Curated annotation (Swiss-Prot):
One cellular-component annotation, GO: cytosol
EC number(s) given by UniProt: 2.7.2.3
Name of the protein this chain belongs to: Phosphoglycerate kinase
Subcellular location: Cytoplasm
GO biological process, one term: gluconeogenesis
GO molecular-function terms, A-Z: ADP binding; ATP binding; phosphoglycerate kinase activity
PROSITE patterns documented for this protein: PGLYCERATE_KINASE (PS00111)
Pathway(s) annotated for this protein in UniProt: Carbohydrate degradation; glycolysis; pyruvate from D-glyceraldehyde 3-phosphate: step 2/5
EC class name: transferase
Residues binding substrate: D21, L22, N23, R36, H59, L60, G61, R62, R113, R146
Complex and partners: Monomer.
Amino acid sequence: MAIINMSDLDLQGKRVLIREDLNVPVSNGVVTSDARLRASLPTIELALAKGAAVMVMSHLGRPTEGEYNPEYSMQPVVDYLAKALSCPVRLATDYLDGVDVAVGEVVVFENVRFNVGEGKNNEALSQKMAALCDVYVMDAFGTAHRAQASTHGVGMFAPIACAGPLLAQELDALGKALDNPARPMVAIVGGSKVSTKLTVLESLSGIVDQLVVGGGIANTFIAAAGYNVGKSLYEADLIDEAKRLVANAKSRGADIPVPTDVVVAGEFSPTAAATLKSVSEVADGEMIFDIGPDSAEALAKIIESAGTIVWNGPVGVFEFDQFGEGTKRIAQAIADSKAFSIAGGGDTLAAVDKYGIADKVSYISTGGGAFLEFLEGKELPAVAMLEKRGA
């Protein structure tokens, strides 16, 4: 990829505009989860160390576009950054017609979604943003799949458009996992519905050696294999699709294994009693909420021998401990594996946290939708823009 990297540029005395993903939860004016803010700090600190005058922009929440709403103000983010960085940090509310920023200072722009035209990638808005800087840095992988004024349009008009360290790191990790993976390659795709991940399953079934399906997705594959799934969440209209994916994988020597044992209950609740059953013994009134220990061990063995692991989605309802053993075993196997592993998606990251394996996963992706679209083989607009500007 012919993308310019911020780390390679001379930024001394330059006005540098960084698009970060600082969309964090806020309660009573205080940031309640700072993972994205912490992830952005090295990029901001590097720009400061290189002698830049730094401007930072992001969206926060989903305000009505074009309307100021104090509930979605960037002020709590500014307060956090002011403590985390050893330099002056301030909020700029009216910045589109120009903003004063000194070398060694950080100015955070108010929520980009307060600007009319942000979502539609408005050209006039993009040009105004571009006019504010000498160098535009796209560092928000989580929004790279959206063609918006602050993620795409501005980069088309800025004097220089480059990738920040966080984005570059993400693209390197995904490239390593998907473009030239060490074999065998194993993908674990969980989630409630085949329909929401069909293109991911399609894409991965063409490149992996083993495609492990979990959650509601697995129920559709279990039904496709001819077993009763009782009252489980599954998609009857996608059984033929599941059969086709299994046949396609087999035709190229790959496999989509179906669980041999499952954990069931009569209701979906934190207090539901879990029962272990063979996959062939699920009764009409039961729901499958996890894979059984035999299936978990079989999958752990597959993971242990892998060269590359891509994990997107749990294999059971791990939020309830009685249905979490399958996901826990998978997490342990990934942690113990010597393979290059990449994990992404909200539920997956919650499982990584719950089972304490964050430091054992080679790379944790910060992008939800962008991670999925990359797995689908789709071109991400922000990445395409950076390639065009780098050519």
